[in-house]
């Protein structure tokens, strides 16, 4: 993977999406690409898609499989990451401790020490979904001193919150002077 770089007049950034299985990473990936809702299967390995919009940094989105047997390889995808997106199933309160533990393990990796974090609280269309303040507190996001982060509500199913998530991603990228200097 690369990092933010300039090729001619274009800048590119590597975005890695991680999260537990069934959090909605692949559906989010294809919705961000502008596709209508697509049926997905559990990701074995990873999916990679470019996201280019005129006037913006070109993004390469890496959707890394979240099944427990694949998580050991997550660290293999971190080198050269410019933004880490952690997708959380807001309706799966039973697996929240597991999601928190996996996120902390990823963030402990030295290769992402200064990489901004965007947490996408997916499945917000479900009435029982955890609220953003509850997710923020349970993930301990306020304790991530020295790291730029944002938390956004979204729904891969309906597309709600995805434009705001993309804008947040771009804002985090712009604010990351270390990323731009790489």
Swiss-Prot record:
GO CC aspect terms: cytoplasm; plasma membrane
Lipid addition sites, N-myristoyl glycine: 2
Keyword GTP-binding: yes
Pfam families linked to this entry: Arf
Single GO molecular function: GTPase activity
GO BP terms, alphabetized: intracellular protein transport; vesicle-mediated transport
UniProt KW GTP-binding keyword: yes
Keywords from the named record: GTP-binding, Lipoprotein, Myristate, Nucleotide-binding
Binding of GTP, residues: 19-26, 63-67, 122-125
Function: May play a role in apoptosis. May act as a tumor suppressor.
NCBIfam families reported in the protein's UniProt record: small_GTP (TIGR00231)
Family that this chain belongs to: Belongs to the small GTPase superfamily. Arf family.
Name of protein: ADP-ribosylation factor-like protein 11
Species for this entry: Bos taurus
Lineage: Eukaryota, Metazoa, Chordata, Craniata, Vertebrata
Gene (UniProt): ARL11
């Amino acid at each position: 993977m690369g990092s933010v770089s300039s090729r001619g007049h274009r800048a590119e950034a590597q975005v890695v999406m991680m999260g537990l299985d069934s959090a909605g990473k692949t559906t989010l990936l294809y919705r961000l690409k502008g596709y209508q809702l697509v049926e997905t299967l559990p990701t074995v390995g990873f999916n990679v898609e470019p996201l280019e919009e005129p006037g913006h940094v070109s993004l390469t989105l890496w959707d890394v499989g979240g099944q427990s047997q694949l998580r050991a390889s997550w660290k293999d995808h971190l080198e050269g990451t410019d933004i880490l997106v952690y997708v959380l199933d807001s309706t799966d309160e039973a697996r929240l401790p597991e999601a928190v533990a996996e996120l902390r393990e990823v963030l402990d990796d030295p290769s992402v020490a200064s990489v901004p974090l965007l947490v996408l609280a997916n499945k917000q269309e479900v009435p029982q979904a955890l609220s953003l303040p509850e997710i923020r507190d349970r993930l301990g996001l306020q304790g991530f001193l020295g790291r730029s982060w944002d938390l956004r509500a979204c729904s891969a199913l309906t597309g709600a919150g995805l434009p705001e998530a993309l804008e947040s991603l771009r804002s985090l990228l712009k604010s990351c002077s270390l990323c731009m200097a790489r």
